[in-house]
Amino acid sequence: GGYTSTYENISISLPDNVSSYDTLEVFHEHACEDRRNRYAKSEGGYGGCHEWDYLAYMKICDRDNASKCGTEFMRWITTYGRGGRWLTDITPYLFMLQDNDVRNFKYQGANKGTMTVKLLFSDWDVGERSFSGEKMFDDGGQFAGEYNNESRYNRQHNFTALSNYHSVKIVSTITGHGFNQDQANCAEFCDHEHHYFLNGNTAYEWHPIVYDNQGCEKEVDRGVVANQFGSWPYGRAGWCAGQDVKQWTYDITDWVDNSTTNNLRYKGLFNGQEYSPQDTNGGDRRIRANILLVWYAQN
């Protein structure tokens, strides 16, 4: 299929002891046709793996409406011309699953092959476990001069502290896509920053590998599939070809005012400032952002 146009639906029955675990990982194998790297066929054309890197998602469907599957659960970027296997820690999302749950998931991607996905639960005595979460802000947007325009995008989130919580954290999954559209090469090859502001406090996520031509090659120990074809070694903003997209987590427990409504604000910046593209030729420079506020209880 085309760009993230292929879907596969699956229903998973969870055991009766999910709540006893404090760690959640996802194993995913993307095995290409013939389980071979991309190759030229003698009769013409190509076999084996797909040529290009593409986004792939696994989304969890609503508990009360299995046909509504808009909540992101996992994100990957496929390889250039090879298969891949990844093990990803998404422990903050434990709150989405309950004992004896029967949940539907939708896998969304662009490349054919055999897809294996497993949920792995374990207990590491980490001392806390997520029990609630809420989506914040819009899903990124065009990084083209109006990313922080609140008449176009929701960039504020009001919340009140839940009772009996132990900690609360920002959990984000952010990647930038599109290049050769402006002087800074946004949003795939520019280091956009993602800033959060609450009650006089601030923190931000950034992507320092984007200017390193071996940035993704250096990420092999963190899951990047090595020896791909194409430009896979180049560092990107929040991702690498042939890698699971990692969550960014930041503890804001000490920022929260438990006695009143809290207003958490978000901005996407470039070099600490509002981004205005220079020498632009139009095109797409999109940031894909999934940002949650996740609450934890002592475990």
For the regions a language model picked out, list residue spans one by one.
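Extracellular/secretory-pathway and virion-surface proteins
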Residues: 1-299
